[in-house]
């Protein structure tokens, strides 16, 4: 029997990308799903498809940057299912702009609110229920949560913050049976980059990543599901990601150079489009 059979699972950022695909994978394994995002029409679309796999699904339209909305997610889940077994903090937004070019620094505050505080708020309200169920907490971060990347200052800061928070929380929860799994994807074929915030604070409307460097969302989600099921401490995707972790310790300047060249290469790719 699947580890997710009748597992009450909350997925934030479930209307597209990794969150959407994860909803389908867990629905197929018998999970009872609570899907949340801001766009109600997209949530309904995802929920309808998830139900075709026989899953029980409820949706909650919410902005995870708001504490009250996160409390609503948890309260709705408890009212519907009576418990929480897994919390997947997946909601996020990104950026493509050098810090010196940013017109209004408040855009970084919004990124931090969504990516970091959204995870903190949801975890705060869900934690008593997760302790009761000896459940799972999952933070979907990014390889930019492990290294610095130019043009991603605000995004990298938010993902580094997620890592610090969840790594610390894991230690606090070690004796109560709640696992904390951190996920570090590289570039994945989702819409997050096309909706990235540019220097002017508006969506950039272009994906600057060479398609040859992108992992499919299906492959990414397969890895995530296995990591959640195994209650792994962390899952660093791609060979480059794993190598980067070690190089950062022994040759941080090399990693800085690799990150710089990668961004410059992506810029040349955009110029050819």
Which residues make up each language-model segment?
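The beta1-alpha1 cofactor-binding region of Rossmann-like NAD(H)/NADP(H)-dependent oxidoreductases
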Residues: 40, 61-72, 105
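SDR active-site lid
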Residues: 175-239
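Residue(s) in the substrate-gating loop at a strand-loop-helix junction
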Residues: 142
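Conserved mid-core segment of classical short-chain dehydrogenase/reductases
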Residues: 94-109, 151-154
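Conserved glycine-rich cofactor-binding loop
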Residues: 8, 15-17
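Active-site helix of classical SDR
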Residues: 123, 158
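Conserved glycine-rich Rossmann-like NAD(P)H-binding loop of the short-chain dehydrogenase/reductase
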Residues: 29-46
């Amino acid at each position: 029997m699947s580890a997710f059979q009748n597992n009450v699972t909350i997925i934030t950022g479930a209307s597209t990308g990794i969150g959407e695909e994860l909803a389908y994978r867990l629905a197929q394994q018998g999970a009872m799903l609570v899907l949340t995002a801001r766009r109600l029409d997209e949530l309904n679309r995802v929920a309808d498809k998830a139900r075709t796999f026989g899953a029980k699904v409820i949706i909650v339209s919410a902005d995870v940057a708001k504490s009250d909305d996160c409390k609503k997610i948890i309260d709705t889940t408890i009212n519907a299912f009576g418990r929480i077994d897994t919390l997947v903090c997946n909601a996020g937004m990104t950026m493509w702009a050098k810090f010196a070019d940013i017109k209004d620094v408040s855009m970084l505050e919004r990124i931090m609110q969504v990516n970091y505080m959204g995870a903190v708020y949801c975890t705060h309200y869900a934690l008593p229920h997760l302790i009761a169920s000896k459940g799972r907490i999952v933070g979907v971060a990014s390889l930019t949560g492990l290294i610095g990347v130019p043009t991603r200052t605000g995004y990298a800061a938010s993902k580094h913050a997620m890592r610090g928070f969840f790594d610390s929380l894991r230690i606090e929860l070690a004796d109560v049976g709640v696992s904390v799994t951190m996920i570090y994807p590289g570039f994945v074929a989702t819409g997050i980059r096309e909706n990235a915030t540019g220097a002017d604070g508006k969506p950039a409307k272009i994906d600057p990543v060479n398609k040859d460097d992108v992992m499919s969302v299906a492959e990414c989600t397969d890895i995530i599901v296995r990591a959640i099921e195994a209650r792994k401490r962390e899952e660093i995707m791609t060979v480059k990601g794993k190598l980067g972790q070690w190089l950062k310790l022994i040759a941080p300047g090399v990693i800085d150079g690799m990150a710089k060249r990668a961004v410059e290469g992506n810029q040349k790719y955009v110029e050819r489009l």
